[in-house]
């Protein structure tokens, strides 16, 4: 109380988020397991006092780790099964060349419906729009300016 009058606040212990702490502890355990332990680190680990609630946290970390491992194994089994099914399906299929040959023979005599049947334009009056203009005043004007339109 006296510190509050002087503008100082009481120091309270920080509140811990148990879900985040469990995840952080799990990551720390995984990091420790992943790297080799030197002799000096082993001595430091022996000297550290264990937390009072550390046993329960370690048990939950082990359970979560086991659950993750079993889920990963189940996912890999499922992927393996789907790949095996696909392989069996590919083994029973006929070669692609036979399928292509069937497509070629079925479409060989038929004309393409998207291509026009006539050789020239259907309407001859449309042809004039695609021809070059022979002479016009505007064309002569552009030619006098050094353009390439003539």
Swiss-Prot record:
Pfam short name (any one): G-gamma
Q: Name one GO cellular component term.
A: plasma membrane
For region Disordered, the annotated ranges are: 1-59
- Give the chief site where it resides: membrane
Keyword Cell membrane assigned to the entry: answer is: yes
Q: Which InterPro entries match?
A: G-protein_gamma-like_dom, GG1/2
User: What are the residue boundaries of the G protein gamma domain, all occurrences included?
Assistant: 71-137
Which top-rank group of organisms is this from? Eukaryota
According to its UniProt record, where is this protein located?
Answer: Cell membrane
Q: Where is the composition biased (Acidic residues)?
A: 1-11
Residues in coiled coil: 65-97
GO BP annotations of the record are:
G protein-coupled receptor signaling pathway
* Keywords for this protein: Cell membrane, Coiled coil, Membrane, Transducer
Q: How does it assemble?
A: G proteins are composed of 3 units, alpha, beta and gamma. Interacts with the beta subunit RGB1.
Task performed by this protein: Guanine nucleotide-binding proteins (G proteins) are involved as modulators or transducers in various transmembrane signaling systems.
Protein known as? Guanine nucleotide-binding protein subunit gamma 2
Source organism of this protein record: Oryza sativa subsp. japonica
């Amino acid at each position: 109380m006296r510190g509050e009058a002087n503008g100082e606040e009481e120091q309270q212990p920080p509140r811990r988020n148990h879900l985040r702490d469990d995840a952080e502890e799990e990551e720390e355990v995984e990091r420790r397991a992943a790297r080799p332990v030197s002799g000096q680190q082993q001595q430091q680990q022996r000297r550290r006092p264990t937390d009072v609630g550390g046993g329960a946290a370690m048990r939950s970390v082990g359970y979560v780790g086991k659950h993750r491992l079993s889920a990963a194994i189940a996912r890999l089994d499922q992927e393996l099964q789907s790949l095996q099914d696909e392989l069996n399906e590919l083994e029973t299929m006929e070669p692609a060349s036979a399928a292509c040959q069937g497509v070629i023979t079925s479409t060989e005599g038929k004309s393409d419906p998207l291509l026009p049947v006539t050789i020239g334009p259907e309407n001859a009056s449309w042809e004039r729009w695609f021809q070059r203009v022979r002479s016009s005043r505007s064309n002569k004007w552009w030619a006098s300016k050094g353009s390439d339109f003539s």
